[in-house]
Amino acid sequence: QGVDPNIHKIDKPQITPIATNRDKSSEFLAAIQAAEVEAVQPVFVDYASDLSVGKMKQDIEVLYKQNTTNGLFSLYYVYDFGTTTDPAFGIASDYFDLLGTDTQSLQEIQREFYDLACSFGIHAGGERIYVTISGLAENMDKAVKLAEEYMQNVEGDDAVLAQLKANAMKARNDAKLNQNANFRALQQYTFYGPEAIRARTLTDEQLMALTSDELLARIRSLSDYEHYVMYYGPETEAKLSAALDAIHRTSQELK
């Protein structure tokens, strides 16, 4: 690309040598070095004893571990399918993150979660989709209700969707000019072949043809699918199951 003649060189400053004292040590360091430390023994997870497996309504499996350290909880709804099964789920989850409902803006919903000291999100991975709710355990019921109402009542915005599509198209075009991205694509092609890549990736035409209703239907339909629940928090297993039976929305018959 040539040499820029406008670049001005700056003289390097003189570096003052630092006298080291590697042969000396403080009393504090000497005490630490002289202390005998017991070797740390490895600890392995035993799923039979470290986790409890229970059931809630609709025969949904609940993986439970009590948090005895603090008053925080993490709750996951895990669906055994993802963008490998339906690549549009990735776009749907990104779109959902930018929307409000017919009665609340996105900022108002975020403020409600903030006031509850809780967070909520939907992550669409290749093999699984995770709905995550976490935060202060005393507000779990309110946070779950807010999250599930948000999922069912989310309202589309065509302007937001158009910008999301434009960003996705730009990212695709930028990736074509990125050597590392091309190497990764070639690696995926070598591992899985062209048909697998086509099945996992929306074409430009498919991406641009997606509608707001199609994408949000995927979010709303999660309550219709089989899934399992993972919980880590201070609530007892019995109280957790009772709470989930009362507040977790599911269809009468899961797909």
Language-model regions, residue ranges each:
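M16 family metallopeptidases and their MPP-like homologs
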Residues: Q1, L63, T69-D97, T101-N153, ...
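Acidic/polar surface patches and capping/hinge elements
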Residues: L207-L210, E214
